[in-house]
């Protein structure tokens, strides 16, 4: 069976469940509608993955070669056992410090994609990320559906406002790595990000971890995240997940036992 993961809005006001389960050749959505889904290269839409073989990169709805035209990535094309651990941080609910403690214990440098609310409410955590050698990336200022933003001015404003807030908070320029909120994108978005000097970073491994009131169990997390790891994986976790905070030590250990090392996404380019 093929499994597809789609990242949706993870803020406290998160609405309808939109994670999809693939059944046979189609997708069963929360709305109960069976839809056919092509996994060929796509210029617009929601980021989607099809996991077909353990230990191998999934098939995505845009190819590595297509994305590279826009300085964008969902995985590194490599046989080396290295992975790029990333966290999306839309708000702080008490778990980020524990995640940072665990990363420090393993001497792992990760990438945190933050939004404006996170920097405004948790500046000390952002400063700690920087101090401890993590990369802080741009997840936009307000976490909108960027695929619906058609003008370059509006697109630039979402990224530039976060850049300014980050620099005001840390005294440092933000490195230009961008993750589209909810994994929603368009080809024009990719072009605009590239024109701003940004690399767009999708992911090749994730699971449904962003619902505060419906967290996966330890067993579910390990079942999803350990066997599907692959060389060059860009892993997406949410810092709002209590399960992630609790299981991260074990997860890192299991990946290390498989021979994996860890890199920041700025080592992709």
Predicted ranges, named:
Residues 49-150, 161-167, 174-175, 269:
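Active-site beta->alpha N-cap acidic-glycine motif
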Residues 98-99, 124-128, 189-192, 247-251:
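A short acidic, amphipathic alpha-helical/loop segment
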Residues 230-266:
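Catalytic grooves of carbohydrate-active enzymes
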